[in-house]
A protein has these predicted regions:
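Non-catalytic helical/linker scaffolds that mediate oligomerization, partner binding
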Residues: 1-474
Length: 474
């Protein structure tokens, strides 16, 4: 019997992996979606990677997805003398928006509004929180600070402002240019960095729709404001990424694990995919095996019910990109075969807009457990059936058959789902026979297995799911 992980794997492409052979090996090892980090690399390099991914999809009949990760208003220090200087606790240092070469007394920032955004007493964290200064005063151009935690202050390190309401828009000029490129390439998912409210998502969606594209949005949760507005953000977006790197700097680190679990649960209830990201197997940047703590981190994300887990520098710049995917895949497979992670059968609220079709999908998930079905099939043009089925986390594999080409690779991010392109509009019996033959040919079912089919009747109507049929494979 054929097998695929229900919990999906995102692998970030970078200098260690941006070639045909490595991307093909990453896919063979278990990667489902490839992340293109637009904080780095030119459009030409990203174009080449996109072409490689689509070539592999054609050659190997795969549905590898592409996620474009926009940089967002990343605040950084400027260039430093000797690429880095030492600052010590108690030192006085000024951050200016003038483009100067920095030293131990004066450092520039690329973010022009920093002196206007901060106030006396605000903390400024640099280099993922390894360095900390506190604001003494600001004159709208220069921010005078006292060093709290010192170290080597290097060129172009990131700045986090955990106490400050940043005035920068969620999309910078660079992001808008990168977005145009991503839309022209019809990427599957666009990740928006430093989301603070649902308005950030709404603005991005309007830009996507204005271009007539169907890319879906991932809201990256990495700001305190995002936690405050998490419910409205989940409602507005198509998926969530718990970006624990910046989030763990912006908020107290001890609250991140509980928020991770809360967000996963909220996303399952909302039928929105959720990705757990950052430092999942960080040691594999230089080591061939993960630590026991990293193994537990990945395992806990799977046990919580995350749709996907993500590798960043491990596959982008690490020494063992393929090993990292293999290790992650091995952890996922063991848990999915041995842990009690299935059948989160949520009751559908009576005021739900799709109350009837949602209940039918719930019954399909519940029935799959009772009859030990091997597959649940959703015939859909919007993908709604796939998202809703996945939210119930059935033990049966979920197969989406659709005439919508965009869904084929988009669904690669969704827990437990594999998609097929199916554009015939024939009788119900013919359609279900085609589906059975396809799943049989690909090794997902065999004679005697139970399939649960769901669809909208009549099939050509593109309406809401209103039909469920049990079928035993001949």
């Amino acid at each position: 019997m054929s097998y695929f992980n229900k919990t999906k794997i995102l692998a970030t492409i970078g200098p260690a992996s941006n070639n045909y052979e490595t991307i093909k090996s990453l896919a063979a090892a278990g990667a489902n979606v490839f992340r293109l980090n637009f904080s780095h690399g030119s459009h030409e390099i990203h174009q080449e990677v996109i072409n490689i991914i689509r070539r592999i999809n054609e050659e190997d009949n795969l549905n590898l997805g592409i996620l474009q990760d926009l940089q967002g208003p990343k605040i950084r220090v400027g260039e430093m003398e000797n690429n880095g200087v030492e600052i010590n606790p108690g030192d006085q240092i000024t951050i200016t928006n003038d483009p100067v070469i920095g030293n131990a007394k004066l450092v520039s920032t690329v973010y022009q509004n920093l002196p206007n955004d901060v106030i006396t007493g605000d903390r400024i964290l640099i280099d993922d929180g390894n360095l900390e200064v506190v604001v003494n005063d600001t004159d709208g151009k220069n921010v005078n600070c006292t060093v709290i935690h010192g170290g080597i202050l290097k060129s172009r390190k990131g700045i986090n402002l955990p106490n400050t309401k940043v005035s920068a828009p969620s999309l910078t000029e660079k992001d808008i240019e990168d977005l145009r490129f991503g839309l022209s390439q019809e990427v599957d998912w666009i990740a928006l960095s430093f989301v603070r409210s649902s308005e950030d998502i709404i603005d991005l969606r309007k830009r996507i729709e204005a271009e007539g594209k169907f890319c879906k949005i991932v809201a990256k949760i990495e700001k305190p404001e995002a936690l405050e507005n998490i419910d409205s953000i989940i409602e507005a977006t198509d998926a969530i990424m718990v970006a624990r790197g910046d989030l763990g700097v912006e908020v107290p680190m001890e609250i991140v694990p509980l928020w991770q679990k809360r967000i996963v649960e909220k996303c399952k209830l909302a039928c929105k995919p959720v990705i757990i990201a950052t430092q999942m197997m960080e040691s594999m940047i230089v080591n061939p095996r993960p630590t026991r703590a990293e193994t537990n981190d990945v395992a806990n994300a799977v046990l919580d019910g995350a749709d996907a887990v993500m590798l960043s520098a491990e596959t982008a710049s690490g020494k063992y990109p393929v090993n990292a995917v293999k290790a992650m895949c091995s952890i996922i497979r063991y848990l999915e075969e041995n842990a009690e992670i299935y059948h989160n059968l949520y009751k559908i609220p009576e005021n739900e807009e799709n109350f009837l079709s949602d209940n039918l999908i719930l019954m399909a998930a519940r029935l799959s457990r009772n009859v030990k079905a091997k597959a649940i099939v959703g015939i859909t043009s919007s993908g709604f059936t796939g998202f809703r089925l996945a939210s119930h986390r059935p033990s049966a594999n979920i197969f989406v058959f659709t005439r919508n080409k965009n869904l084929i690779t988009q669904m690669s991010l969704v827990w437990g789902v594999r998609a097929y392109l199916y554009s015939k509009q024939e009788s119900t019996d013919t359609t279900f026979e085609d589906i059975e033959n396809t799943l049989k040919k690909d090794g997902f079912v065999r004679t005697g297995d139970v399939i649960i089919n769901t669809a909208s009747m009549p099939l050509a109507s593109k309406g809401r799911t209103n039909m469920l049929k049990l079928h035993v494979v001949a």
